[in-house]
Amino acid sequence: RGNLDVLKKLGIAVIGTREPTRNGILAGKHFSGEFAKRGYNIVSGLAIGCDTTGHQGALAVGGATTAFLANGLDWDSIYPKENLDLAKEIVVKRGLLLSEYPVGQSCGRYGLVARDRLQAGLSYATVVVQTGVKGGTMHAVNATIQSKKPLFAVEYKTDEDTSNEKVQGNIKLVKEQKAYALRSTGIDDACSIIEKAHKSINPVQQQSLF
């Protein structure tokens, strides 16, 4: 539902906890906006929290965003209900809502897991805004790692953030060298990594992800 042309742009999945810190909200909007301004399609799942910051950051700069849903595309089925207005804004501003499910299908747990993996499948890179060591975000993280696409985790400096349970996943991924640390000064470097990875992906292999 919406503008299919956004799929012509390289996708970047923006994911994370439903309970980001204050700086996590700011970071999600900032990085999504910066990538959107550089021509990327910001892909997320319309969830409360980090997903919302991804969509909002892209929309705020007039950029492209796609929401993968775990429910039907009709307004009555939108989940969560708190983001119904955001879903409508995405369509009005020429973004896109995508779903595997028929009209009238409500959200189920399996649908949420599948949605998380599909976000990574549609994208050429994944940005983790904030995540704990365990949680739903890891479905998309693992899908990104398995498909050998670039994974970025936002780096935080304040004690308030680095001591927060919802940031420990970011710290662990960078420490284990599974993700690049994403800083506000490193967006262009991140774009270079993404472009290089995109060029190395065989088109036939990429099609098999959908």
PLM features: residue spans?
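Glycine-biased, small-residue-rich flexible motifs in mid-sequence functional cores and linkers
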Residues: 1-210
